[in-house]
Amino acid sequence: MPYTAMATRHTSVPITAAAVVADDCPIVELRQYTLHAGQRDVLIDLFDREFVETQEAQGLRVLGQFRDLDRPDQFVWLRGFGSMEARRQALEAFYRGPTWAAHRNAANATMVDSDNVLLLRPAWPGAAGALPQHARPAAGASGSAPGVLAATVFHLHEAATPALLDFCRHRMAPTLQRGGARHVAWYCTETSANTFPRLPVREGEHVLLGLALFGREAALEAFTDSAAWARGVAPGLAPWLARAPEIHRLQPTARSALHA
């Protein structure tokens, strides 16, 4: 199932005191939607106007919304929860509530597929603590927020092992930070049963998700061109990988709380 959009102006709306921040979310979804041609900004406008505060009112956290810079038909967002049971309760409340009932047809009309969803948890305590959560502009803003988020899905042969996570902490993360990433976070597959089966998630696979926030697109390009990852990380990482990683360059929407 879907729901997405974008909107906002230049009046800041602070994240409420009751809202959790990235490191307070033991359960996170990475949601990637494939849209009909020309419909991404239509969905972003709707999402940012109607589906941010109304979801958070049910106890979840909309962590960030993004355009995939290399896939014009892709909208990507992150959503966090306090637990799997909290996820069930929040999603039941939202998807059975008046906001979704009023806008679901418009949202669904933009989408080809909304089932590409990874259910994740922080890879270790504090692994997501570096992700910033900024105050949002008021609904009505357009364009984009600063920075670019490099999101890489590493497909693994098995669940992330202590040895892999040690390599992640001491080789992968420092390489990104030396290469200009301002903030880095890591998630791995949450293996609990989907508590809200109305919204499917990808099952039967093991992943490590790396999020690296760069201040500018040029900074990410400079890191990529440096080949530091290819030299210092890729050879050591290869034995854990089942196939080539998925790499996404994500531009925050105007109302994304996660941006540079």
Over which residues does each language-model region extend?
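A short acidic/glycine-rich loop-to-helix N-cap element
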Residues: 42-45, 105, 220-224
